[in-house]
Curated annotation (Swiss-Prot):
It holds the Pfam family ketoacyl-synt. The modification O-(pantetheine 4'-phosphoryl)serine is found at residue 1780. This is Non-reducing polyketide synthase Preu7. InterPro entries: Ac_transferase_dom_sf (IPR001227), ACP-like_sf (IPR036736), Acyl_transferase_dom (IPR014043), Acyl_Trfase/lysoPLipase (IPR016035), Ketoacyl_synth_AS (IPR018201), Ketoacyl_synth_C (IPR014031), Ketoacyl_synth_N (IPR014030), Malonyl_transacylase_ACP-bd (IPR016036). Residues 420-854 form the Ketosynthase family 3 (KS3) domain. One of its GO terms (molecular function) is 3-oxoacyl-[acyl-carrier-protein] synthase activity. Residues 1743-1820 form the Carrier domain. The gene is Preu7. Residues 46-284 are annotated as: N-terminal acylcarrier protein transacylase domain (SAT). Residues 956-1287 are annotated as: Malonyl-CoA:ACP transacylase (MAT) domain. The lineage of its organism: Eukaryota, Fungi, Dikarya, Ascomycota, Pezizomycotina. Its cofactor is pantetheine 4'-phosphate.
């Protein structure tokens, strides 16, 4: 046999090419090899052996091993399917045959013989196959004369059959699988027959009693004689007779039913007197010829697969019979198996005969040596070695195969396919509770052992109204606690091309998934399409999400355009794919609490299946819906105590809900290593199953968890005892924690296999720190483990608040299971990897497990990067972010002054996405870099981004001769493999033409002034330029046009596609050689003159020189080059040129003699022209140009295929190079323009200066090389400039030659330009939902509430008309009043404050109600109280109360006043409308009333009085000087009425007003007129306070023509002294816009009496709205006409006594869709509504522009929630976040509001703002 040897020299044999510590030794001629297969397992840990073999099978070097395992598993599956149900049920599911080794009960049970037989064959054959695959030339079929013999015992004989039948190693998997099948079938037969002889006791999980005893020091005859006597005397049935199963010279083995074996040792004196040992034979009888017959044998081997094998293979190596000691005489496979099975079943073992047979064969062939292959040494091998020791001429030794399995790999493992790869995690990011906005802050929470639970924040919902600790109120939560992300609405909408409106309506968890995905990708160094594994078509996204809170609650309050796309789960990962342009799959997965980890498992599966090469995965959860809290409370899931999860605590009562967003980036390990990624952790295996046998769907099941864990460990080939940390699910529920600890200890710390002191197992659960993130719980746990691996520490567990759960095993310490109560070190250990398990299960029954190990250790590279200068770049999508990124980088450099500059450059260039705001610094040191970065900070605001219209065009300009040293030493040649390869290939082409090598002119072989031949010099120049051009192109910089100067034109022609590289070299060399041959050096000269040709001609001495030569009128020189307006090169005889140079120098012109051998473009070249043209005609092929060629010869641009030919080259050699005319012509034809980037291709920049002198503007101009400067410095600076101009540089190519030694740094992530996009859930409709519970609640509490009528309560005022309910205790009470707005005094008060012609219940009326109820409660609870002073605080009116038109029907409101403790001095008030006799659940106003001391108020106001008086005096001065407006009583109220509010006479208390901007004071006189019953008359309050409203609606500092302002409330209202009829006061206010929202204004109104502040309305708020909404906001509720009224703007009336300034461009707030301070009572119409956005998002609307284009721009800005300044001409609609959905909306509004009819594809046809603006101007102006 080729791979192991043969018994016949004519057959092929394995011959290794070398030896190793564990290899087949070279066997010389005449030597033999014996392979022995035992009938016992090796003494090693079987589980570990099988795990190691499984790991080897995943290696590409062991494809045959993998195939054998697969074939053997398939064979066993087939056989199991054929078993009867009763037996089949005993065998658990198994993925591979190796899984069965861990099922101890199965191997000891009834089918133990079948299972162990199959496993023994499997381990022997797998070891043999793997061993030979690992050998050098392991598949060799070279011949040798080695003779191989096979021997085995018992089942081991079956293994020998596979070896004998396999002609090559590649045949072993099929033959081996058949052996495994027959071994299993044999075991089944033996069990069935033996069961008839002695049944196994029922429910016996042990291995039972032995069926064989060995008796030493007796002969077979003695034993047989005694047995015969016993059988005869007892009349033993034949089948039950004991028999000899093995015979040797020193012992005899007897076999039979265990009971009969025991019996004979009791009844027989002979046997009682013998020593004996019971053998581990528990599966039944073999070697029993009196039991088994041919039919039995046939039943074992009669399989279709053996028939197929029989046709393909025949025995090739002799197998020695253990009965005869001779080879089996089989000719076919079937015969061989028949003989072997027959021998195992019927023949006694006589090993001595085998030893003698092998020794005889060794003597016969006169062997000089013998190598014995064994799995482990054993007694039979010892006997064989002893036999050989008696043969002096034969030296024998053994080679154990088992040690190969665990030997260290000399080479790194290469997966056999994607399915066997490990998964590397290369990037991670998060947003976690407790302010953890990144992974480092998350680690700080873990490391410090923090519990970050808190009360449910107000931005989610009002916890006070939605929480009921008693659990009686419908839809209320039983807990007020959770763990929450800070400000989950923060988002950089413009970065992700989303409009503010879309961002607002998009679920914040989906937004944060997008953000963290970017950060994780950024940290992973992901750049799309950089490598094969980063191909965008092969990247998928996988996210777990189990709730839609924001869609269900927040956006559902006002469903708009993005309700579906912003809220449905599928759009989360879909949006990530869309933004990054990933074409791989995107999955949103919901498996409840295990969603995130199950998703990561699915992502791993996608990578293993080869569906994707990179996966972005994670989980997300942001809690805003009180329903889920209520539902989980009702299901008894949630803890009621103030803590995160009390994991493993004795009092654990449920989990604490949590937010969280986690994103990770995964690749197959080999791809990650190939891509030079940072590997954070390695996933070895992952799996998901279901707790099908749990007692309920929500109840966890330890058995299912254990099964899954074992399955994952088995797949990965990991010993459970090698796992040192388990991150448990640990929700803090009694059932969950108890079940999980059972599964964990059962697998990782079993009682039967103890952990040693050096194998501690730590357990933990992150939920004790940050709560249970539900869908993100698993990724959060995984993130914790990754950080533990990174930080080399285990953080403390903080879940046990009291004592440990009593249900936990009491022997955790004995099992070495540890709970880390303090931080524990977890360092790397040489030779042993840290391995952890993340466990996760779900209330829906799912279990997910991920097995993770530490990343491979990376060796530090000592290789020094040879590049002298490096490019570090910073980019961003906005100026704010650019500044932030610069600041973060500077901070990083300050913290890491020793950072590797090459690594930093590599990370910021090749491993980052780049954006339109760019900064690039070429630097050689960190200190310089930090200084340069800092210098950019002050100019960020003026920094211009690159155009969004695309990269600028590029022109390559190729240098002519004379610009470099005679000999160069190019660093690029030495260090850049791409450039070097290009030059060497060109040099090879040159040498192939018989030309000299030009490399010596470039590689530093000579000094700089060493002069090479013109041929070498010119070839070196042109080839260097070609290589440089190719190098630039490899960096992604491709020319749009080329221009060559003189000799440089040859390189330009090649780059333009006219000449091949070979032809270019040919022409350059031929021309140079002709010059060398036909022209003398030194006779002519070229001189560069800093002057124009006209200036040169004007020099008198030049003309005189010509005359003196007798050639008057003819120049004494030739014009070689016209390079620019004042750059000219002259050629001629050396002597004449020296004279010309002297003359011009004296005339003041700078002259430089060029270092060239010949005077090109002069008469010196005439001798070569004919010959050169002829050879160019025949020797070169001219192709059409692929790029425009700017021709200095012709002074024009060449586009056609006819112009460049041999004659062109002739003329170019002789005639003038007119670079000036060429560039001017290119400019006229628009071949070049001011946006062009100029790159000089040559040894030194020359042409760039020419171009700059010719063109008025040059975008950027950079050289490739610069004389006297390190190439890397030049290239780095040039690349930085090119990159900053907008060209996308292939930085990965720039670093390719050095990447092996470069490292990706963990730099700060992107600095987001965040704004808070958040729709607030308002009210309590989640509680009520149309149910009657809360109505019934009022009824159910009726006994404690005493309905009162007039006789019970005497309280009657105009606004507080009836007390309908009241409840009083000693210190607490609730009072509910009901009033009819149609009651005359109340209605008069409302009509005294008319807006839009409607009576409006002003805030002063609400104040009177509050004062009245406050006074009533105080007198009831504390009747003796005196001097009651009340502060109405935090008044918030969410909806205006407008009086009905119909005054005949009542219009009721109810106001409740509640205090829980009057001693606390706080009363809570709520206003509600009454419909159909029932108060609405939703209030329209709220306030708090505080009982305070008026004396204390007066004291606090004393310091402010001086300031207020000084401001009043200043306003008086401004009015006196004519700067401030002084308005009379009538004028003031006429303006007020014209602009917004028409006050009744009693309200008109302001006698005069002085106003300057938004600051004013008024003299006030309160009316003495009486009418109505009030506590504080509303017209008094209004008179002293409505100055603020007057300023906001009348001042010319506001755009009152297009906007109006209303107040939703104030922070406080206090009157230290009563307002008295006829009293005189002075009011002062200054309103100030808030920084967060310029449409919201705040101010304090001070009320003075006799120059003393006696009252104050603090922080009164006004909001600005478009006047177009006035009709909608303020119309009578019972008047439907306003719904159909015109939408034209209601402008203020003009009066003759006032002047108005021109309306200014003012910022108009985009009102929130849902807000706590919205005034309107009805929804706004679409055409009049301003769009939704967040605070601070403004739109600059220039109201004085009447053009359709301007209006359209304003409409676009308003709809998208942008500023007009954002609508720059080159900005695309995609960048603004205007997608197809919004484009339809805008198109419709164009039609409705502007009369511009467009279709929905408008923004495809006109993709930028400039395009749209131009179209509108053209067609609608």
């Amino acid at each position: 046999m080729a791979w192991i040897g043969t018994h016949n020299p004519e057959l092929l044999s394995f011959t290794p090419s070398g030896t190793s510590d564990m290899s087949i030794e070279q066997v010389n001629a005449g030597e033999i090899r014996v392979a022995f297969f035992s009938n016992e397992f090796p003494h090693d840990d079987l589980g570990n052996l099988f795990r190691q073999l499984h790991i080897h099978s995943n290696d590409r070097r062991h494809l045959l091993l993998a195939r054998f395992i697969h074939e053997a598993t398939s064979a066993l599956h087939e056989e199991v399917r054929l078993l009867p149900n009763a037996l089949r049920a005993l065998i658990p599911p198994f993925e591979t045959i190796f899984n069965l080794v861990d099922h101890e009960a199965l191997r000891n049970g009834r089918l133990g013989g079948a299972i162990n037989g199959a496993l023994l064959c499997a381990v022997q054959l797998a070891t043999l196959i793997g061993f030979y695959e690992d050998q050098p030339n392991g598949h060799s079929e070279d011949t040798d004369s080695v003779e191989t013999l096979l021997a085995g015992l018992g089942i081991g004989l079956l293994s020998t059959a596979a070896v004998s039948l396999a002609p090559t190693l590649t045949h072993m998997p099929i033959a081996g699988a058949e052996v495994v099948r027959i071994a299993f079938r044999l075991g089944i037969l033996v069990d069935r027959v033996s069961e008839h002889l002695q049944p196994r006791p029922p429910h016996d999980d042990g291995h039972g009693d032995s069926w064989a005893y060995v008796i030493p020091d007796v002969t077979a005859e003695e034993v047989q004689r005694e047995l015969d006597e016993i059988h005869a005397s007892e009349a033993t049935p034949t089948a039950s007779k004991l028999f000899l199963s093995a015979i040797s010279q020193t012992s005899v083995t007897i076999s039979g039913p265990p009971a009969r074996l025991k019996h004979i040792f009791l009844v027989s004196d002979f046997f009682r007197s013998q020593r004996f040992v019971s053998l581990p034979v528990y599966a039944g009888l073999c070697h029993a010829k009196h039991i088994y017959n041919k039919d039995h044998v046939d039943s074992v081997i009669d399989t279709p697969s053996l028939e197929a094998l029989d046709a393909a293979s025949a025995p090739r190596i002799p197998i020695y019979s253990t009965n005869t000691g001779k080879p089996f005489p089989a000719k076919t496979s079937k015969e061989l198996f028949h003989l072997i099975v027959e021998e195992i079943l019927t023949q006694a073992i006589q090993w001595d005969k085998v030893v003698e047979g092998i020794l005889t064969r060794a003597r016969d062939v006169q062997a000089s040596g013998c190598q014995i292959l064994v799995f482990r040494n054993s007694l039979p091998v010892h006997d064989l070695m002893a036999g050989f020791s008696g043969l002096d001429q034969i030296k024998a030794d053994t080679l154990e195969l088992i040690p190969w399995i665990s030997k260290p790999d000399q080479c790194p493992t290469v997966p056999s396919g994607t399915a066997t790869s490990k998964i590397a995690i290369v990037g991670m990011s998060c947003r976690m509770p407790g302010g953890a906005t990144d992974t480092e802050k998350f680690w700080q929470i873990l490391e410090q052992g923090l519990d970050v639970h808190r009360k449910i924040p107000a931005d989610r919902f009002d916890v006070d109204s939605h929480y009921d600790p008693e659990g009686k109120r419908l839809n209320a939560s039983h807990t007020p606690f959770g763990c929450f992300i800070d400000e989950p609405g923060l988002f950089d909408a413009s970065f992700f091309n989303m409009s503010p409106r879309e961002a607002l309506q998009t679920d914040p968890m989906q937004r944060l998934a997008l953000v963290t995905a970017y950060e994780a990708l950024e940290r992973s160094g992901f750049v799309a399409n950089r490598t094969a594994a980063s191909n965008a078509h092969r990247v998928g996204t996988f996210y777990g999400q189990a709730s839609d809170d924001y869609r269900e609650v927040n956006t559902a309050q006002e469903i708009s355009t993005y309700f579906i796309t912003g809220g449905c789960r599928a759009f989360g990962p879909g949006r990530i794919n869309y933004f990054f342009k990933f074409s791989g799959p995107s999955y949103s997965i919901d498996t409840a609490c295990s969603s995130g980890l199950a998703t990561i498992q699915i992502a791993c599966t996608s990578l293993w299946a080869g569906d994707t090469d990179t996966a972005v995965a994670g989980g997300m959860n942001v809690l805003t819906n009180s329903d889920a809290f209520a539902g989980l409370s009702q299901g008894h899931f949630l803890t009621k105590t103030p803590n995160a999860c009390k994991t493993w605590d004795a009092e654990a009562d449920g989990y604490c809900r949590a937010d969280g967003i986690v994103s990770i980036v995964m690749k197959r390990l080999e791809d990650a290593e190939r891509d030079n990624d940072n590997i954070i952790g390695v996933i070895l295996g992952a799996g998901t199953n279901h707790s099908a046998d749990a007692i309920s769907i929500t109840h966890p099941h330890a058995g299912a968890q254990s099964y899954l864990t074992r399955q994952v460990l088995s797949q990965a080939g990991v010993d459970p005892l090698d796992v040192s940390f388990v991150e448990m699910h640990g929700t803090g529920t009694q059932a969950g924690d108890a079940q999980e600890i059972i599964s964990v200890t059962d697998v990782f710390a079993p009682t039967k296999r103890r952990r040693t002191a050096k194998q501690p197992l730590y357990i933990g659960s992150v939920k004790a720190n940050v709560g249970h993130g539900e869908a993100v719980a698993g990724p959060t746990a995984l993130l914790k483990v990754l950080l533990m691996l990174q930080k080399e520490a285990i953080p403390p567990h903080v879940g046990i608040k009291n004592t440990i759960n009593p249900g936990f095993p009491k022997d955790l310490e004995k099992r070495n299971v540890n709970i880390p109560y303090q931080k524990q070190p977890w360092p790397r250990t040489p030779g042993k990897k840290r391995i952890a398990v993340v466990n996760n299960f779900s209330a829906a029954g799912g279990n997910s497990t991920v097995l993770i190990e530490e990343p491979p250790a990376r060796e530090h590279s000592d290789v020094v990067d040879p590049r002298s200068t490096h490019v570090v770049v910073i980019s961003a999508k906005s100026k704010v972010s650019l500044k932030g990124n610069l600041q973060r980088m500077i901070a990083y450099l300050e913290a890491n002054p020793d950072v590797s500059l090459p690594d930093l450059a590599y990370t910021t260039t090749a491993r980052r996405h780049h954006h339109n705001h760019r900064v690039a610094v070429a630097t050689s040191g960190v200190a310089h870099l930090k200084k340069q970065m800092g210098s950019y900070l002050p100019s960020v605001e003026t920094h211009r981004p690159i155009p969004s219209t695309g990269a600028p065009p590029v022109v390559f300009t190729f240098t002519g001769q004379g610009a470099s040293y005679r000999s160069m030493n190019l660093e690029l040649f030495h260090h850049c493999s791409y450039f070097r390869t290009e030059l060497l290939e060109l040099d090879s082409l040159a040498q192939g033409q018989g030309l000299p090598s030009f490399i010596q002119a470039l590689d530093g072989s000579h000094e700089q002034d060493y002069a090479h031949s013109p041929t070498v010099t010119q070839l070196a120049l042109v080839c260097t330029e070609i290589a440089l051009a190719k190098y630039w192109e490899s960096l992604g910089v491709r020319p749009d046009a080329v221009v060559g100067h003189s000799l440089g034109e040859y390189a330009a022609m090649h780059v333009a596609g006219v000449l091949s590289a070979n032809d270019t070299i040919f022409l350059v060399a031929q021309r140079a050689m002709m010059l060398e041959k036909n022209c003398k050096t030194g006779t002519h000269k070229m001189v560069a003159v800093r002057a124009s040709l006209d200036e040169i001609d004007s020099v008198a001495e030049i003309a005189s020189l010509a005359e003196s030569r007798g050639v008057a009128g003819v120049r004494p020189f030739e014009v070689a080059c016209i390079n620019g307006p004042r750059d000219t090169v002259l050629s001629g005889l050396s002597k004449e040129m020296d004279e010309v140079s002297d003359i011009l120098t004296r005339a003041g012109f700078k002259c430089i003699s060029l270092d060239v051998a010949f005077a090109f473009h002069s008469a010196q070249t005439d001798p070569i022209l004919d010959e050169f043209e002829a050879i160019a005609t025949t020797g070169a092929l001219f192709q059409p140009p692929t790029l425009p060629i700017i021709s200095p010869l012709l002074g024009k641009v060449i586009f056609d295929e006819r112009t460049v030919n041999a004659n062109y080259l002739r003329r170019a050699t002789r005639e003038t190079v007119n670079f000036l005319a060429a560039i001017e012509s290119a400019q006229k034809t628009s071949t070049i323009d001011e946006t062009m980037v100029w790159i000089e291709i040559g040894p030194h920049p020359v042409c760039l200066g020419f171009a700059k002198s010719i063109l008025p503007t040059v975008n950027a101009a950079v050289p490739s090389l610069r004389r006297g400067e390190n190439n890397w410095q030049t290239m780095s600076q040039s690349l930085g400039t090119v990159f900053s101009s907008g060209i996308e540089v292939r930085w990965d190519e720039f670093h390719r030659s050095f990447e092996k030694h470069l490292r990706l740094l963990n730099l700060p992530t992107y600095a987001w330009n965040d704004k808070n996009y958040w729709i607030q859930y308002n009210g309590d409709w989640a509680l009520t939902k149309g149910n009657t519970f809360y109505d019934a609640e009022k009824t159910s509490k009726a006994p404690s509430r005493v309905p009162v009528s007039a006789k019970h309560s005497s309280l009657r005022t105009s606004t507080v008309q009836h007390i309908i309910e009241e409840t009083f205790s000693a210190t607490a009470c609730t009072v509910v009043m009901q009033s009819d707005l149609m009651q005359p005094d109340f209605l008069a008060a409302a009509h005294g404050h008319k807006m839009n012609g409607c009576g409006v219940v002003t805030s002063s009326i609400h104040a009177d109600i509050a004062f009245t109820l406050g006074e009533y409660l105080m007198k009831k609870l504390k009747p003796k109280a005196k001097d009651i002073s009340m502060n109405i605080a935090d008044l918030v009116v969410t909806k205006g109360l407008v009086a009905n038109k119909n005054t005949e029907s009542p219009q009721f409101i109810q106001v409740s006043a509640t205090t829980h403790d009057i001693e606390a001095g706080v009363v809570h008030l709520e206003w509600r409308n009454v419909v159909s006799g029932e108060a609405l659940a939703e209030n329209f106003a709220t306030a708090k009333l505080h009982y305070e001391s008026s004396g204390d108020w007066l004291k606090t106001w004393i310091p402010i009085t001086h300031f207020v008086r000084s401001r009043i005096e200043a306003l008086e001065g401004l009015a006196a000087d004519g700067f401030a407006n002084r308005l009379t009583h009538d004028m003031a109220y006429r303006l007020f009425a014209n602009n917004l509010v028409d006050y009744a006479q009693k309200y008109r208390g302001m006698q005069s007003v002085v106003m300057y901007g938004l600051e004013a004071f008024a003299d006030v006189a309160l009316t003495a007129e009486k009418g109505g019953v009030w506590t504080v008359p509303p017209y008094f309050i209004d008179s002293v306070a409505h100055l603020a409203g007057f300023v906001m609606n009348v001042s010319d500092a506001n755009d009152t023509e297009n906007n109006f302002c209303v107040t939703p409330g104030w922070r406080s209202m206090r009157f230290a002294k009563p307002l008295i009829p006829g009293g005189r006061y002075r009011s002062y206010v200054k309103m100030i816009p808030t920084p967060e929202d310029p449409t919201v204004f705040l101010g304090d109104v001070y009320i003075l009496q006799e120059s003393v502040v006696i009252g104050m309305v603090g922080a009164i708020e006004f909001r600005q709205y478009p006047r177009i909404l006035l009709n909608r906001f303020f119309s009578a509720p019972d008047d439907s006409s306003h719904l159909h009224s015109s939408t034209s703007v209601a402008k203020p009336k003009q009066t003759s006594s006032t002047t108005t300034s021109q309306a200014k461009s003012v910022p108009v707030t985009v009102p929130e869709l849902v807000t706590a301070t919205v005034i309107p009572t009805e929804p706004t119409p679409v055409e009049a509504a301003a769009p939704a956005a967040t605070k601070g998002v403004t739109v600059e609307v220039k109201v004085d522009s009447d053009s359709t284009a301007a209006k359209a721009m304003a409409l676009v800005a308003a709809e998208a929630g942008l500023e007009l300044a954002d609508l720059e001409d080159d900005v695309s609609f995609g960048e603004l976040g205007i997608d197809s959905l919004m484009s339809l909306v805008i198109a419709e509004k164009f039609r409705e509001q502007l009369g511009v009819v467009v279709n929905g594809s408008l923004f495809l046809e006109y993709p930028t703002m400039g395009d749209l603006r131009a179209w509108l101007v053209e067609y609608y102006s």
